[in-house]
Amino acid sequence: MSGTFLVDEINYQKQQISISDPENCMVKRLLTFNTSGSPFSYGFSFYYTFLTCPNEVVIPVWSLMSIPCLSNSTSSFFATSNLTFSKLLPPSCQIVKGLYVPVDVIYKDVITEEKGFSTVPWLGNVLLEWSSPNCRGCEKESLRCGFKNKASLEVKYLADPPDETKSRLRPLIITLCIIGGITATCIAAIRIYNSERFVNQRRQNAAITARNTTQQPRGVVVTTGLDQSTIESYKKVELGESRRLPGTNGIICPICLSEYASKETVRCMPECDHCFHVQCIDEWLKIHSSCPVCRNSRS
């Protein structure tokens, strides 16, 4: 295990550490990842097959989601935990590697029941464990832990501070926690409220602007939009935590100029793959049949 990683979280009670790649491509690091020579090991792991396919290969029935940081203009990179699918690849696809990947145990049932290609729950970070030194007992009992001596990894419980000192600090700690909790809750509530108001206002303005464009002078040819069944036939994508979209799409809706949020649903144009909030693009397509970004229309 070598190289530089970002430490996202450390759980001392479970003795787990969550790490990620500074360049935001943890999958690439996993292909050469090895915990030998380090105190860390995999907790729960699952076997994945990594593969690459030319971009012209279309596999719609598999709902295949590519790994953006390893894909390029000619080929796309994928991963699957389904061994059956990995054996039924088109001839133009190639298996790059198969290996066990550390996965948070909360994804166990999702991966086991999966019928298609994986959404790669470990795309952002990897969860590792360590067993030595073992301080689980200390952490579980909220005690202090230390080494018995400098030449050993054995641990021992350390003496607690005098009761008098703890009794003086306890009221202060409780007061600070209450004040901090109330302040944080108020700030979070204000930010959420303002954010929702801002997003809703932008979307309303975008919808009004789209409607106003239909008010053409007499004698001017008015471009008709699409019917609802055609609009619904355009692909919809539910965003994950990373909010990544295929192609040149960013994390901002080009219509309302609001950032996408995780779990939001976007709709993509079939010819150019430009994506937008479902509410925004649906309003637009009722009036126009072309993409708001590149003006390509469905032939």
From Swiss-Prot:
GO terms for biological process: protein ubiquitination. One of its GO terms (molecular function) is zinc ion binding. It is an enzyme of class 2 (transferase). Belongs to the RING-type zinc finger family. ATL subfamily. SUPFAM superfamilies: RING/U-box. It is found in: Membrane. This is RING-H2 finger protein ATL20. Its EC number is 2.3.2.27. Keywords: Membrane, Metal-binding, Transferase, Transmembrane, Transmembrane helix, Ubl conjugation pathway, Zinc, Zinc-finger. A zinc finger (RING-type) spans 253-295. It is a single-pass membrane protein. It catalyses: S-ubiquitinyl-[E2 ubiquitin-conjugating enzyme]-L-cysteine + [acceptor protein]-L-lysine = [E2 ubiquitin-conjugating enzyme]-L-cysteine + N(6)-ubiquitinyl-[acceptor protein]-L-lysine. Pathway: Protein modification; protein ubiquitination. It comes from the Eukaryota. The RING-type zinc finger domain mediates binding to an E2 ubiquitin-conjugating enzyme. The chain crosses the membrane at residues 172-192. InterPro entries: ATL20-22-like, Znf_RING, Znf_RING/FYVE/PHD. The gene is ATL20. One of its GO terms (cellular component) is membrane.
